């Protein structure tokens, strides 16, 4: 019997991982929960008492929900429901300044509420949904950069060079006088122009959105999936090395690893846990301070 069109489209991201599907989904969810709960805490530590009473409540809810998901399997669904609710309140209370990755995290939580990794049919649907979520986010990240127009001529990167993290890693792409001119601007009305003649910076700017748009369909096609996965992970690592949006980077890298052959999540969750420990020690002052968001 021929599958309906929507089922054939959903199956495009399938792999040869039926035997390890449940295990890799559980490992992904464990890493994801660690990231989300750590994000609540690491955001609160430097601003303790300044984020409002509602944030204290959300911090408590996310901590209890995360512990329940990790420690008591039968509380998985209510735990993810609590995390989703906490994120929805966070998005509502901080709109429009809330980070885009909070929406992505909310979608993942809602999928986990609706679908169970230990059910063969539901685990297949959850894995497909998570993979398509990664493809859609990657593709439309590139489309958004193109549509807004601030990457084609490099304006966004030039504007971002006003921050220390961008200057440290990308300052070498511009002559010293251009870099000094950009550093003097503060993003106020009348500042500019935010355009430069550096061909290297233009290649980096346009290469970013082009890579995002190209890698997304390459992840779907099995013949190019492995190469696309490596390329996407390197792209995300490069972007986050500059932008320092580490929580989005960890979540999205975990989503991308769902395209890998076999069960890579079981090992990746320990790497995620180690990275979060390092970030926590940095924020607590035990390790040298690192700027991240």
Report the location of each language-model feature.
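Alpha-helical membrane-anchoring segments
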Residues: 2-293
């Amino acid at each position: 019997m021929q599958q309906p069109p929507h089922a054939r489209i959903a199956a495009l991201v399938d792999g040869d991982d039926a035997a390890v599907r449940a295990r890799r989904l559980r490992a992904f969810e464990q890493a994801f929960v660690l990231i989300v709960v750590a994000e609540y805490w690491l955001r609160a530590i430097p601003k303790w008492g300044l984020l409002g009473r509602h944030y204290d409540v959300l911090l408590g809810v996310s901590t209890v929900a995360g512990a329940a998901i990790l420690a008591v399997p039968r509380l998985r669904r209510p735990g993810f429901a609590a995390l989703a609710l906490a994120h929805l309140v966070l998005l509502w209370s901080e709109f429009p300044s809330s980070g885009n990755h909070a929406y992505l995290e909310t979608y993942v939580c809602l999928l986990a509420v609706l679908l169970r990794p230990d059910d063969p049919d539901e685990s297949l649907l959850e894995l497909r949904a998570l993979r398509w979520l990664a493809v859609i986010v990657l593709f439309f990240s590139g489309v958004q950069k193109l549509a807004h127009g601030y990457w084609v001529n490099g304006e966004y990167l030039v504007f971002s060079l006003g921050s220390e993290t961008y200057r440290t890693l990308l300052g070498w792409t511009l002559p010293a006088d251009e870099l000094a001119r950009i550093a003097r601007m503060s993003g106020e009305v009348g500042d500019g122009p935010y355009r430069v003649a550096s061909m290297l910076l233009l290649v980096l700017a346009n290469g970013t959105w082009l890579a995002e748009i190209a890698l997304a369909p390459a992840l779907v096609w099995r013949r190019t999936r492995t190469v696309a996965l490596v390329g996407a992970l390197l792209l995300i690592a490069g972007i986050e090395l500059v932008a320092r949006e580490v929580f989005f980077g960890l979540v999205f890298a975990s989503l991308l690893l769902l395209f890998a052959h076999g069960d890579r999540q079981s090992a990746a969750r320990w790497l995620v846990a180690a990275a979060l420990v390092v970030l926590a020690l940095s924020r607590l002052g035990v390790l040298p301070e690192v700027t991240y968001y």
